[in-house]
Regions:
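Proline-aspartate-enriched helix->loop->beta-strand connector
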Residues: 11-12, 63-72, 80, 110
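Helix N-cap at the beta1-alpha1 junction of Rossmann-like dinucleotide-binding domains, i.e.
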Residues: 19-23, 53
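Conserved beta-strand scaffold in the Rossmann-like NAD(H)/NADP(H)-binding core
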Residues: 48, 115, 152-154
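Aromatic pocket-lining residues of Rossmann-like dinucleotide-binding sites
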Residues: 2-6
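NAD(P)-dependent short-chain dehydrogenase/reductase
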Residues: 32, 103-106, 127-211
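Conserved residues in the N-terminal Rossmann fold of short-chain dehydrogenase/reductase
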Residues: 49-50, 92, 183
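Conserved Rossmann-fold NAD(P)-dependent oxidoreductase catalytic core, especially the SDR/UDP-sugar
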Residues: 73, 77-136, 141-143, 150
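Conserved Rossmann-fold cofactor-binding substructure of NAD(P)-dependent oxidoreductases
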Residues: 47-70
Length: 212
């Protein structure tokens, strides 16, 4: 969704990086169809790159080769129960992977870095939240030593996103139930996927140093 909204601002080039090859392929195909239907500026250059944020050398090559104006960092393991079972995976990916991206942005002179975080980073009570809080702290400490604009955007529940409660509820209902909830009196607050993407883009424009 973030890429879909970015193309409406007519960037000269959009570099889409993911470890999920199928998602990356399908997104590029969607954009090519939009170009053919003249729903998107045909002059926008599209690059699809399969790279893991854990591969420090590859991330540095990416930044040095393309020198992007803005980096939006959304890669993370976010499923709370799974990360409780595999905390080392959460640490390797969420902390050290993000560190690779931040370091590369600083060392390669990228102008802006925007990181997707979570409200679970506030007084974290689980592994996922703790890893995201550590990445926020690293971003803030690193930004004192490099002259680029950095910010983290904290999200709560994004309606319909992968791993969010609505797709889980739909699947449970489809399979005949039961529908599981944490507690019968719990309240959840949601934003839509387009609203979340707009917030990230606004943060990219207004972000100052070390803001969350």
């Amino acid at each position: 969704e973030l890429c879909r909204q970015i193309v409406h601002f007519n960037p000269s080039k959009l570099i889409m990086v993911d470890i999920n090859e199928n998602a990356l392929y399908m997104l590029k195909q969607e954009f090519l169809v939009m170009k053919r239907k003249q729903q998107m500026n045909d002059s926008i250059q599209l690059e699809s790159l399969i790279i893991s944020i854990r591969e420090r050398e590859e991330i540095y090559k990416l930044m040095k080769s393309y020198k992007p104006d803005v980096v939006y960092h959304a890669a993370a393991h976010k499923h709370v129960p799974l990360m409780e079972d595999r905390p080392t995976e959460a640490i390797r990916n969420n902390i050290f992977g993000t560190k690779n991206v931040i370091d590369a942005c600083c060392d390669c002179g990228i102008s802006r870095f925007i990181m997707i975080s979570t409200d679970k980073a506030v007084n974290p009570t689980n592994v996922m939240g703790a890893t995201k809080r550590m990445t926020e702290m690293y971003m803030q400490s690193r930004n004192t030593k490099c002259k680029i604009h950095m910010a983290a955007v904290r999200f709560g529940n994004v309606l319909g996103s992968n791993g969010s409660v609505i797709p889980i509820f739909k699947e449970q209902i489809k399979n005949g139930g039961p529908v599981t909830v944490t507690h019968r009196d719990i309240k959840r607050y949601f934003m839509t996927i387009p609203e979340a993407a707009q917030l990230v883009l606004q943060a990219g424009f207004y972000a100052n140093e070390r803001e969350i």
